UniProtKB/Swiss-Prot annotation:
Location(s) in or outside the cell: Cytoplasm
Sequence positions that bind Fe(3+): 76, 78, 242, 317
Record carries keyword Transferase: no
Cofactor binding mode and count: Binds 1 zinc or iron ion per subunit.
Species in which this protein is naturally found: Staphylococcus aureus (strain JH9)
Coiled-coil regions, chain positions: none
One example GO MF annotation: zinc ion binding
Binding residues annotated for Zn(2+), in chain numbering: 76, 78, 242, 317
Protein name: Imidazolonepropionase
HAMAP family: HutI
InterPro entries in alphabetical order: Amidohydro-rel, HutI, Metal-dep_hydrolase_composite, Metal_Hydrolase
Amino acid sequence: MNDLIINHIAELILPKSTDKPLKGKELDELNVVKNGTVVIKDGKIVYAGQHTDDYDATETIDASGKVVSPALVDAHTHLTFGGSREHEMSLKRQGKSYLEILEMGGGILSTVNATRETSEDDLFKKAEHDLLTMIKHGVLAVESKSGYGLDRENELKQLKVSNRLAEKYDLDMKHTFLGPHAVPKEASSNEAFLEEMIALLPEVKQYADFADIFCETGVFTIEQSQHYMQKAKEAGFKVKIHADEIDPLGGLELAIDEQAISADHLVASSDKGKEKLRNSDTVAVLLPATTFYLGKEDYADARGMLDNNGAIALATDYNPGSSVTNNLQLVMAIAALKLKLSPSEVWNAVTVNAAKAIDINAGTINTGDKANLVIWDAPNHEYIPYHFGINHAEKVIKDGKVIVDNTLSFKA
């Protein structure tokens, strides 16, 4: 006897399962089954496809008029941080620049101070609250970066918190050491601080899967970033890079040359960089909510990347300064509107390709896969990025069990 059948599904989303990320035109290929059925036993998918009455189960969910998809994957977050920076919104409205806010004690260094002052247990409680919000919105796989400690003690603290979260909730969660995220005030130079972070790599390896660096004007150069990435690979890490967010320094080209698993942001990437994606499996992780939140007009050139047969994914970039959202559904809407992605491209970018960007087996619904699914209160898959700003996830299913039920009930 099976454990659960989800029947009469209006649309069942079945992303293509591949060893490598979907590239170029492949991203627009999405198998959407009308009147579908999913059968689950022992936390695994037994069947997913056209409606059938050939299976029995102890529990049945009628998904008439609903969409079922793989659980979403958020491939770029800064989940563990102390404090918040809502007071900076009024400063921005007054016309204060980021550098002016930084000089006033705000910006990223404000978050660094708050993170340093927050105990590990309190940091865990805050991050847990934010993670549960993600889960309620349909996310069951997450990448979590450090980068707000900027010293040994507090970078380790952030990584330990994300590891504790993964253990408590048994999630597909990857952890990224982003020590070189900024340069703290106490550092004698960028170069000296970078060497401090490189020296930490062997110690943080037990807590982190990836090593990341912020390659940008005024932070770390291309040469420094390459040095760090090579040292990280020597220490056994797969590497990522925050690249070309503001200036076209060549971060995307560097990521491809160093065989990074992903390059993230890429708002200002050059045509040369986009062309190099053609022969690379490095995933371009685009973060349109960041561009939106910062009030900028120029978004990453997703269409240019796809035209060059590149692989792209989408993520929230959840952080307290430039993308204060942990709702990946909102990112899907912004990507459709501003990156000009089709519904199929959007869905693949938050499932199977996002999984490839963090090196996990997720984002598909195939026989034998973990039964990590979302039942959406939506008539079709195009409706979710169309009707933006709300939570369409009705039920979230992890390992075959409903762990979130957002069904609303009211008393008159």
